[in-house]
């Protein structure tokens, strides 16, 4: 799997692939992919890191584990493949975006446009069994994605971390470099969005920070497909 990382994440994360926890994880995944339906496809597991290189990462939106329905997950947190109905949390993200910028809600949940602009759409667990949320929790992915966050924390150039909900906010302890910025609220899930996600203006906050740093702002508008 380490050969998949073809950009600057490769040498940074290379040592992880040699560690015992990752060897155990790789063995577990081999069996899981052989015996069960696992999402995303093997070739999509590291898409977040593929689309958004270490040096190009401006923003991190931290998710939990991949969508576990057919053909949804493709390696980017909150994003779904073209032709798949937009999930409820992402729909709420779009509603907040509409309220902030006036953008129409698109007919898809394909967030590659964000990833290509430097928004790292990272789940803390990168695989899941079909229909079984959190089924790959505690198998080693958390060590790996914690290392991703630690590496970004070590970077001199500031990163904006968007932490929605308690699960994401638990990673705040890894962000110790005071040059980085943290934007947090409750999760956009329908269960919590009205308790402080709606009206939190995360997208314009990101762009204000980027503009103040002299960086290109993110074009958050997702086009219809």
Curated annotation (Swiss-Prot):
Q: Which Gene3D superfamilies does UniProt cross-reference here?
A: Uracil-DNA glycosylase-like domain
What biological-process GO terms show up in the record? base-excision repair, AP site formation via deaminated base removal
Sorted UniProt keywords: Cytoplasm, DNA damage, DNA repair, Hydrolase
Report the leader peptide range.
none
Among SMART domains, the record links this protein to: UDG (SM00986), UreE_C (SM00987)
Q: What is its main location?
A: cytoplasm
Localization, per the record, is: Cytoplasm
Pfam families associated with the record: UDG (PF03167)
Q: Which reactions fall under this protein's catalytic activity?
A: Hydrolyzes single-stranded DNA or mismatched double-stranded DNA and polynucleotides, releasing free uracil
- Give the residue spans that cross the bilayer: none
Q: Name one GO molecular function term.
A: uracil DNA N-glycosylase activity
The record's active-site residues are 65 (proton acceptor)
Entry annotated with the keyword Hydrolase = yes
**EC number per UniProt:** 3.2.2.27
Q: What class of enzyme is it?
A: hydrolase
Entry's Gene Ontology cellular component terms: cytoplasm
Would you identify the family this protein belongs to, as annotated?
Answer: Belongs to the uracil-DNA glycosylase (UDG) superfamily. UNG family.
* Role played: Excises uracil residues from the DNA which can arise as a result of misincorporation of dUMP residues by DNA polymerase or due to deamination of cytosine.
- Return the protein name: Uracil-DNA glycosylase
Q: What organism, scientifically named, is this protein from?
A: Bacillus mycoides (strain KBAB4)
Q: Which gene encodes it?
A: ung
């Amino acid at each position: 799997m380490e050969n998949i990382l073809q950009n600057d994440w490769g040498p940074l994360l290379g040592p992880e692939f040699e560690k015992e926890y990752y060897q155990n994880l790789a063995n577990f995944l081999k069996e899981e992919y052989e015996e069960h339906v696992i999402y995303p496809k093997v070739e999509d597991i590291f898409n977040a890191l593929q689309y958004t290189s270490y040096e190009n990462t401006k923003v991190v939106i931290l998710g939990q584990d991949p969508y576990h329905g057919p053909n949804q997950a493709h390696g980017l947190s909150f994003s779904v493949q073209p032709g798949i109905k937009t999930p409820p949390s992402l729909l709420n993200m779009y509603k907040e975006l509409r309220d902030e910028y006036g953008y129409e809600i698109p007919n898809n949940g394909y967030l590659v446009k964000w990833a290509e602009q430097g928004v790292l759409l990272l789940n803390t667990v990168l695989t899941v069994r079909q229909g079984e949320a959190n089924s790959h929790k505690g198998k080693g992915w958390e060590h790996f994605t914690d290392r991703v966050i630690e590496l970004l924390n070590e970077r001199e150039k500031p990163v904006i971390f968007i932490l929605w909900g308690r699960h994401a906010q638990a990673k705040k302890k890894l962000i110790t470099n005071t040059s980085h910025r943290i934007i947090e609220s409750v999760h956009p899930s329908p269960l919590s969005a009205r308790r402080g996600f709606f009206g939190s203006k995360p997208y314009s906050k990101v762009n204000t920070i980027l503009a103040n740093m002299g960086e290109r702002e993110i074009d958050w508008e997702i086009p219809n497909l």
